[in-house]
Structure formats: structure tokens, C-alpha cells
Regions:
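C-terminal motif of bacterial Sec signal peptides marking the signal peptidase cleavage site
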Residues: 11-14
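Bacterial N-terminal signal peptides that target proteins for export
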Residues: 1-4
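Alpha-helical segments in soluble extracytoplasmic regions
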Residues: 39-123, 127-177
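Short, low-complexity, disordered segments immediately C-terminal to signal peptides
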Residues: 16-39
Length: 177
């Protein structure tokens, strides 16, 4: 029993004069006293910016929705100018607030793709005659063919990116409704 008494003394008194660390105080919970922050609705400026993105998409896509087109040099130039309008319009719109930054990033990427398409259409127009023709089998014919393919592909890619931006904007709009 003497051994048991020594063990109890050690357990209660600590070892070799060291004191046990005091037990930590229970953590206070402030959840009940502080209300959860609510999301503020989008501002009128943010909503206007979202509307401007939708309008931009329609403006850029409009010339490409024709049921048929004759690819004259003027038409190639018109298509290039329509694609180039994305970057100009985005600069005019300016950057939105922080909540719409993911949308802004997507629109910026779309405008970059569309600008590449504009350069492709300009290249195609530069090797074409007034009615859009080139001499078959020439370097100009190959450049025109590649450039037109490039322009239409870039338009499709840019339009898809703008659609993605509109979807992201709709999700953000719903989140802050």
C-alpha cells in the first residue's frame, strides 16, 4: 500500500516540482451574438454591366447569323470589324466590381479570341479582290482559305466564351438576388 500512496501523491502533486499546465478556458462562441452577414443585392451599375455583356454578345454575333453570305472583301472587312468591336466595347464598359470579376475575366478572354478572328478576316480581305476571289492554287488562295477558317473558328470560340460569361453572370445574379 505504501507504493499506492506514493503514486497518488505523484499524480496529485505532479513530478519533481513541476506544476501541471492550467486547463484551457472553454472557448466562447460568438455565433449566437453576431448575426450572419447577408449578401447585398447587385447594384444598378452591376446589373447594367451584365446587360451590356448580353448586348455586346448580340452585337458581335449579329453579322454571323445571316442565313447566307457572299464573302466579298467588304464582307470580310465587316466581319472583322464586328469582332474587333468586342475589345472596344469592353474598354468602354470598364471593369465591374469585385463580385463580377469572374465574368470580366471570361469576357476579356472572349474579346481576345474575337480580336484574333478580326485579324484573320483582315488577312483574308487583304489577299482577296473586290468580289472576294483569288486565283485557285495560288499562295493567296491558301492564305484566304486558312484565314477565313481561322476567323470563323475564332468567332465561334469567342461567342462560346461570351455565352459562358453570361451564364456566370446569371449565377452571380441569382446568388445576390
Amino acid at each position: 500500500m505504501a507504493g499506492l500512496g506514493a503514486a497518488v501523491l505523484l499524480a496529485v502533486g505532479g513530478c519533481a516540482g513541476h506544476q501541471a499546465a492550467p486547463a484551457p478556458a472553454p472557448a466562447r462562441s460568438t455565433a449566437a451574438s453576431t448575426p450572419a452577414p447577408t449578401a447585398t443585392p447587385l447594384t444598378a451599375a452591376e446589373l447594367a454591366w451584365i446587360t451590356a455583356v448580353t448586348n455586346l454578345h448580340h452585337k458581335v454575333d449579329k453579322p454571323f447569323r445571316a442565313s447566307s453570305m457572299t464573302m466579298t472583301r467588304a464582307k470580310m472587312t465587316e466581319l472583322g470589324n464586328a469582332l474587333r468591336a468586342c475589345g472596344r466595347e469592353l474598354r468602354r464598359m470598364g471593369a465591374p466590381g469585385t463580385r463580377l470579376q469572374p465574368v470580366y475575366v471570361k469576357v476579356t478572354k472572349a474579346c481576345q479570341a474575337l480580336d484574333r478572328g478580326a485579324r484573320c478576316f483582315a488577312k483574308a480581305a487583304s489577299v482577296s479582290d473586290a468580289v472576294g476571289g483569288t486565283v485557285a492554287g495560288t499562295v493567296e488562295a491558301r492564305i484566304q482559305s486558312r484565314s477565313l477558317s481561322c476567323g470563323f473558328a475564332a468567332q465561334g470560340n469567342g461567342s462560346n466564351l461570351l455565352s459562358g460569361a453570361e451564364e456566370r453572370a446569371a449565377a452571380i445574379k441569382a446568388q445576390f438576388a
